[in-house]
Amino acid sequence: MKRSKSALALAALAAALLFSPFHSEDASKRIPVQTLCIRFADGVYQVQTDGGLRGFGADPATAFADLERSAPGLPAFSTARQLIVADNDMDSFSELVFLECLHPGTEVYRSAAPVDAGDVTAFLNRHAAGVSVSRLRSAVLTGEAIKLPEIAGAGGRYRICDGK
């Protein structure tokens, strides 16, 4: 009787471990991301990280997936503190802010011209003023217009302008 209960308990434990939604992951393969820049040009979305990783795609989700595939490890998009949307002709802005890989607290900025994610990271870490992803999600759902702060400058010399 004790053996059958023990065997049943072991079988239940093994099944729970095999079918558990939690999977182990090698933390050394995670690539930290502080800043993400996304731009739309010539019909293609381009995502760049502060570490120099790039991804391209027909929509934001495809560009993020391409960046993940081409990276030497697993980019930790959820650790990004800043997201810069370059160029004003992005049609899929609402699709972008609802990507599950983005942390709700990530601050969003816009830029009239493409900026280098690596260059702008130190500046934004000192001068945080963006609108959070969660605030933008709420605005998209309610139809509220939100002005994003604009990053202006280049080559390590940046400033934050009032949103438009």
Regions of interest found by a model, annotated:
Residues 1-164:
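Membrane-proximal alpha-helical signals and transmembrane carboxylates
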